[in-house]
A protein has these predicted regions:
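Acidic, polar-rich low-complexity tracts and alpha-helical solenoid repeat scaffolds
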Residues: 1-195
Length: 195
């Protein structure tokens, strides 16, 4: 702990790992494994944190602090989200682990923050769909654009992107001569957003 307090994270994590290896049957072994993960997390070494936590979760299946391990794991993936327009891997992993927390540990302090983070992830995923839809519109690929806008409406209905997606669906259907479809989306737009 002394090394951790001095911000010598790598050395502290190694010492925690060493303690786990030297005393595998003690109550300190899983605690040391969690502390190694926390040491990395505290200094933003998220990849190392993920490795430590995955080992912990695999090894200590009945540990009472698995909720904390899942939470740190989810946060580590969440903090690795750099550009949602390119790579969804970290977003989807974060979403997966936040859902595990909400499902398996609903009465913990971590569940509330996990729900909030899931809402933010939904916004990120919806923005990805909108980015792709606009990409198709710019290239006059109407059908793929329509499909992406529909995905926003169907899968991300609580996000801020629904209004724009409906607006674009009205435009695209009208442009394609599908007036009835255009009117359907226009009525949804008017009813829900008074647009």
């Amino acid at each position: 702990l002394e090394e951790l307090e001095k911000n010598d994270v790598i050395y502290a994590a190694r010492k925690f790992n060493e303690a786990e290896l030297l005393y595998p049957q003690s109550v300190w072994a899983p605690r040391a494994a969690l502390m190694a993960a926390y040491a990395y997390f505290s200094q933003l070494y998220y990849d190392d944190t993920i490795v430590e936590l995955e080992k912990f979760l695999q090894k200590y299946k009945n540990h009472p602090r698995r909720d904390y391990a899942y939470y740190l794991l989810a946060l580590s993936h969440y903090n690795l989200i750099i550009d949602e327009t390119k790579d969804l891997e970290e977003i989807l992993k974060a979403k997966q682990y936040f859902k595990i927390i909400i499902k398996n540990y609903p009465n913990t302090e971590f569940a509330i923050d996990s729900e909030f983070k899931l809402e933010l992830i939904q916004e990120i995923l919806a923005s990805k769909e909108m980015y792709l839809a606009r990409y198709y519109v710019d290239r006059e690929k109407w059908i793929p654009a329509i499909n992406r806008f529909k995905t926003v409406i169907n899968d991300y209905e609580t996000t801020i992107y629904v209004e724009e997606a409906l607006h674009r669906l009205v435009e695209l259907h009208y442009k394609l001569g599908l007036v009835d479809e255009s009117k359907k989306y226009a009525s949804l737009l008017g009813y829900n957003y008074q647009s």
